Amino acid sequence: MTVGLGMPQPPAPTLAPRRATRQLMVGNVGVGSDHPVSVQSMCTTKTHDVNSTLQQIAELTAAGCDIVRVACPRQEDADALAEIARHSQIPVVADIHFQPRYIFAAIDAGCAAVRVNPGNIKEFDGRVGEVAKAAGAAGIPIRIGVNAGSLDKRFMEKYGKATPEALVESALWEASLFEEHGFGDIKISVKHNDPVVMVAAYELLAARCDYPLHLGVTEAGPAFQGTIKSAVAFGALLSRGIGDTIRVSLSAPPVEEVKVGNQVLESLNLRPRSLEIVSCPSCGRAQVDVYTLANEVTAGLDGLDVPLRVAVMGCVVNGPGEAREADLGVASGNGKGQIFVRGEVIKTVPEAQIVETLIEEAMRLAAEMGEQAPGATPSGSPIVTVS
């Protein structure tokens, strides 16, 4: 039996067809049902610190981020947008709250899109016409970003709290104002920190419009909790074709958000799979320390960006079968490991040599695929300096 490397051809099917939407361009990244679901993150730097912000954007880009958002709370941040947008490797979205003048500054600076929060921008309804005209002239989209924590007080008073209906009504009200001014390049988010409320809001929104949807669980929490919340919510929606771009919100470095986002999309066959480690959860049958083995293999292959499935199995029950189905694998037992490549046993090695052997074979397979191994390029994060 021969198992081919990488993703099957044609690509594995998804659970549901994408919801049909209008199409937008955020810089060179398409957003909408005709385009792949994209991954976003947001810089944690002070935007006016241009070098630090560009450095973080470079790190996010290297991690697989498609679109990046930057905060713009002060004039000095608005003044830095043009330089950031000019030097960023990926499209930059300006995140605007409170001051409408920063919307126009972001458009003039060449940002690829602007996110507006209708719940806290002063007298925003009365400025929509100006914003629509400026964004239309620049050819950039607007994201109407409704958030449970800053919901427009009119809808808070009407519904009593940030219900799915309140979030959706707020978003569609603002969208209707833009449409009245002939502007339709809109994407929408209706974020809540409760994934159940968030999913209900996006389901309602998806049924009522054809705008592309930006998915997010706001204030999701620390890395572990936030990952679970986001994965549950995104999986519930994306598996039914709802969602066109995602941002995982974590109290963690932004690169971790990108890693989680990419893994969610890969798990749903919405993005070509990269390196995947398959390992058993261990039990009383395990004859090796599976946890340590899997962690050491993962660490040794960190940075290897190939569609390669590596199975690390701890016993003879499921081990041989899983190892055969992977591109590369080991079935361990009795102080040794059988190494499988493309479904065939190529060697048996002592337990102490399993990690080293798996890494060597992974590098060899990567070379066959024309990929560079970790360390083949200068190590460390990309360095960006703007003088």
From Swiss-Prot:
Cofactor note as given: Binds 1 [4Fe-4S] cluster.
Keywords, alphabetical: 4Fe-4S, Iron, Iron-sulfur, Isoprene biosynthesis, Metal-binding, Oxidoreductase
Pathway listed: Isoprenoid biosynthesis; isopentenyl diphosphate biosynthesis via DXP pathway; isopentenyl diphosphate from 1-deoxy-D-xylulose 5-phosphate: step 5/6
UniProt-listed Gene3D superfamilies: Dihydropteroate synthase-like (3.20.20.20), Sulfite Reductase Hemoprotein, domain 1 (3.30.413.10)
GO biological process: isopentenyl diphosphate biosynthetic process, methylerythritol 4-phosphate pathway; terpenoid biosynthetic process
Catalytic activity field: (2E)-4-hydroxy-3-methylbut-2-enyl diphosphate + oxidized [flavodoxin] + H2O + 2 H(+) = 2-C-methyl-D-erythritol 2,4-cyclic diphosphate + reduced [flavodoxin]
InterPro entries: Dihydropteroate_synth-like_sf (IPR011005), IspG_bac (IPR016425), IspG_bac-typ (IPR004588), NO2/SO3_Rdtase_4Fe4S_sf (IPR045854)
Top-rank lineage group of the source organism: Bacteria
Assigned EC number: 1.17.7.3
Enzyme class: oxidoreductase
GO MF terms, alphabetically ordered: 4 iron, 4 sulfur cluster binding; 4-hydroxy-3-methylbut-2-en-1-yl diphosphate synthase activity (ferredoxin); 4-hydroxy-3-methylbut-2-enyl-diphosphate synthase activity (flavodoxin); iron ion binding
Binding-site residues, [4Fe-4S] cluster: 280, 283, 315, 322
Cofactor(s) the record lists: [4Fe-4S] cluster
Cross-referenced NCBIfam families: ispG_gcpE (TIGR00612), PRK00366.1 (NF001540)
Family named by the database record: Belongs to the IspG family.
Cited function: Converts 2C-methyl-D-erythritol 2,4-cyclodiphosphate (ME-2,4cPP) into 1-hydroxy-2-methyl-2-(E)-butenyl 4-diphosphate.
PANTHER family per record: 4-HYDROXY-3-METHYLBUT-2-EN-1-YL DIPHOSPHATE SYNTHASE, 4-HYDROXY-3-METHYLBUT-2-EN-1-YL DIPHOSPHATE SYNTHASE (FERREDOXIN), CHLOROPLASTIC
Protein's UniProt name: 4-hydroxy-3-methylbut-2-en-1-yl diphosphate synthase (flavodoxin)
Natural source organism: Mycobacterium bovis (strain ATCC BAA-935 / AF2122/97)
Gene from which the chain derives: ispG
